[in-house]
Regions:
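Flexible hinge motifs at transmembrane-helix junctions and intramembrane kinks/re-entrant loops
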Residues: 214-234, 406-409, 472-476, 483-508, ...
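Membrane-embedded alpha-helical segments and adjacent helix-loop junctions characteristic
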Residues: 246-338, 534-612, 617
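Hydrophobic alpha-helical transmembrane segments
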Residues: 208-209, 227-231, 261-262, 296-304, ...
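Interfacial loop-to-helix junctions that mark the boundaries of transmembrane helices
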Residues: 42-50, 195-202, 220-226, 249-260, ...
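Transmembrane alpha-helix interface/packing and boundary motifs in multi-pass membrane proteins
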Residues: 216-222, 305-314, 345-357, 582-597, ...
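Juxtamembrane and boundary regions of transmembrane helices in multi-pass small-molecule transporters
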Residues: 2-79, 170-185, 335-338, 342, ...
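Structural signature of hydrophobic alpha-helical transmembrane segments
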Residues: 197-209, 256-269, 311, 315-319, ...
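Beta-strand-enriched, solvent-exposed domains that form extended recognition/catalytic surfaces
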Residues: 65-196
């Protein structure tokens, strides 16, 4: 065992009282106490006052707008039926000279998006024109918008277009919408008329500033992450209000994907109840037992256990329940605790990539209605992700072993002092522990598949004493609830069997089943351990992303991306789009939480699919690989990383941003190369869409 010649300044261990909810409430400032204390008191005071003034100014502006600007009225709606070879007129007032018309009905959405592929046969044509009061003289008219009708008369799709009329109504002139039939059968369409649509140019700038503001607040940790998302989402609504498009409360709530929140809430409930049984501590001790106390076999089994549990019980939850016992295990074996915890965080992120419930990004993607409509379910998701995740995990562990084979045993003076302090606090072993030690020593060495470490009997007996399964009946109930959930997910993957058993509902009902079986009269204890701020953070991001979408940001980005893609050969467009989405998501995740990146990039994926002939599924897989593997790039990439760092800080171990980055970022690049190769082979070579 080596001692570093220049050990870092000691960090005192602090107790974090209350429920586990407080782990997320703590900001990343706690992780950077050293940097904060280097600032003078005067500088910190100036920064604090400046921050308060900006936030108060923002609050005042939002409050004023909310009070002054009422929620927008719904667009004018009308049902239009046109007989064969006839034209129908609808009068419209155009105060701003622009109107957005949406048509709902049996329209061919694809051919209207890509008119170069149609055969010139249109069902109707629509234009906006300025005419006289007798409707027989046209002073100005827009270009004809040709409507391609769907061969399926029961289809109900929506297409939209903005029209600008340079000459408005007045005097003998009036603006009308003309719908002309071009087929031998009647045409019936539901028409929505919005005479005050958003103009894209300035709106895109506002949207860009909103996203930049959110990134700055989170990256520089100006305020709590959840509050940052809430205040920026509120600002987005205020901007829409200034533009006379403020949504009402019902519309705002409809922007939230409650299916993903139900999934995360249910998993949090199940895992926190399971944690009271002691099963997670028992499993960590089990990894020590099967590794016979040998350091690298232990790290391998612990990494695989973390990845497996993260896949099915969520990486954030596993970070909460596995970190404390892992710290104790590292101290018992004299391993460099911070290194082991970073490795654990990396495998939690990679394991979480395997299933829809493995981490928040996967939950956000797989519960989206458009993704579900593409046939993405539990079994389908696991089958697509499994090869890439397995290869990445084994390659990463090999690299970790080669690069940190010796450094994992190099302890700094601070860890030595902590270990010495806690060694002195230990109580003498009980008689039961002594008997267990004697039993382990008497076991024939030949019965071990791996030669035990020198202090293996004493360490194992000490770990077993305080880390047993405390409530076996409750553990059985937890297994029943989980079995119900996974059975329903598998059945949902079979066509026409349990079609309504979506991920969110299944996990939520499994949580309710566990609460019923647990039979506790007081539900407060269960609700207190739910990480409500994570759920609120994600809900605020849903609202913000929808507001940014309404401001035209994703459409603007999509148009420019399509301009680039059209310069490529058609057979290369899917591959380039997939790689672009994969690496952009991963690199953004280095600086901001992967859940936030996922919500924005998912919107971008839909825009790309609507503007170019690119299948959606490859973009879903690219997004999930990029968000999950990209979370390994830095301490801020995933919530689970921060949770591990904060729990480590409780126990006296500091994992700095730089410490995590040095280990995690190169490994992230390796996993991204693996993910890129896998996606190119699967979707470009094999066309596995």
């Amino acid at each position: 065992m080596k001692i570093l010649s220049n050990p870092p300044r000691p960090i005192s261990s602090r107790y974090l009282g209350g429920s586990r909810l407080q782990v997320w409430r703590r900001t990343r400032t706690d992780v950077h106490d050293d940097e904060v204390h280097r600032l003078s008191d005067r500088s910190r005071k100036i920064i604090h006052i400046t921050k308060m003034c900006i936030l108060l100014l923002l609050w005042f502006a939002c409050t004023f707008i909310v009070f002054v600007f009422a929620a927008e009225e719904k667009p004018r709606s009308t049902m239009v039926t046109v007989m064969p070879n006839k034209t129908v007129f609808r009068k419209v007032d155009l105060p701003n000279g622009v109107v957005r018309i949406s048509l709902l009905g049996p329209v061919d959405w694809y051919l209207m998006r890509f008119p170069e592929e149609d055969n010139g046969e249109y069902g109707a044509g629509l234009r906006v024109e300025c005419v006289n009061s007798d409707l027989n003289v046209s002073y100005h008219r827009s270009d004809m918008w040709n409507i391609v009708m769907n061969s399926d008369s029961t289809a109900y799709l929506e297409v939209s277009r903005n029209f600008i009329l340079h000459e408005g109504s007045g005097g003998d002139r009036q603006a009308v919408i003309s719908l002309e039939s071009k087929q031998d059968s009647p045409v019936s369409l539901h028409m929505l008329i919005n005479t005050n649509p958003l103009i894209t140019n300035m709106c895109v700038l506002y949207a860009g500033l909103l996203i930049l503001g959110l990134y700055m607040l989170i990256i520089f940790d100006v305020i709590d992450h959840t509050f940052a998302a809430l205040i920026i989402a509120t600002t987005a609504i205020a901007i829409l209000g200034l533009l006379e498009h403020r949504p009402n409360v019902h519309t705002i709530i409809s922007h939230v994907n409650f299916e993903s929140l139900m999934l995360l809430f249910g998993l949090m409930t199940i895992v926190d109840i399971m944690a009271t049984t002691g099963v997670f501590e028992y499993l960590v001790v089990w990894t020590y037992r099967i590794s016979r106390g040998r350091p690298w076999p232990l790290i391998f089994f612990l990494s695989m256990l973390t990845a497996f549990l993260s896949a099915f019980l969520n990486s954030d939850n596993m970070a909460l329940v596995l970190t404390p016992i892992t710290i104790r295990l590292c101290e018992e074996m004299s391993l460099r605790t911070a290194y082991v915890l970073v490795i654990m965080a990396i495998f939690a992120d990679m394991g979480g990539a395997l299933t829809p419930m493995g981490n928040p990004p996967n939950a956000i993607v797989t519960t989206n209605p458009a993704v579900v409509a593409e046939g993405v379910d539990f079994v389908n998701f696991v089958i697509h992700m499994l090869p890439g995740v397995l290869v990445a995990m084994f390659v990463v562990f090999g690299i970790v072993y080669v690069t940190h084979r010796k450094s994992i045993f190099v302890l700094d003076q601070h860890q030595l002092d902590l270990m010495k302090e806690r060694e002195g606090e230990k109580a003498p072993p009980s008689q039961e522990t002594q008997d267990r030690i004697a039993q382990l020593k008497d076991k024939e060495p030949g019965r071990y598949w791996l030669k035990p470490a020198e202090n293996y009997p004493e360490t194992l007996a000490g770990l077993e004493e305080g880390n047993r399964i405390r409530d076996k009946p409750l553990l059985i109930k937890c297994c029943i609830a989980l079995s119900f959930a996974f059975l329903c997910m598998i059945l949902h993957s079979i066509p026409k069997v349990a079609d309504g058993a979506t991920l969110g509902w299944v996990v939520l009902l499994a949580a309710f089943l566990l609460i019923i079986l647990d039979d506790k009269s007081d539900l407060n204890a269960t609700l207190e351990i739910i990480q409500w701020t994570i759920l609120l953070f994600i809900a605020a991001l849903f609202v913000l992303s929808e507001a940014v979408d309404q401001l035209g940001f994703f459409e603007w980005i999509g148009d420019r991306t399509v301009m680039f893609l059209t310069s490529l050969e058609p057979q290369h467009q899917t591959a380039v789009t997939t790689m672009l989405l994969l690496w952009t998501t991963a690199l953004l995740t280095v600086f901001i939480d992967n859940a936030a990146v996922t919500i924005f990039m998912l919107k971008f994926s839909f825009q790309m699919a609507s503007k170019d002939d690119i299948p959606l599924p490859p973009m879903f897989w690219a997004l999930t690989f990029g968000a999950c593997f990209g979370g390994n790039g830095s301490l801020f990439g995933a919530v689970s990383n921060e949770i591990i760092a904060l729990i480590a800080l409780q126990h006296g171990y500091k994992i700095s941003f730089w410490h995590f980055f040095v280990i995690g970022f190169p490994l992230m690049l390796v996993t991204m190369v693996i993910g890129s190769a896998y996606l190119l082979i699967a979707h470009s070579v094999l066309s596995w869409n």
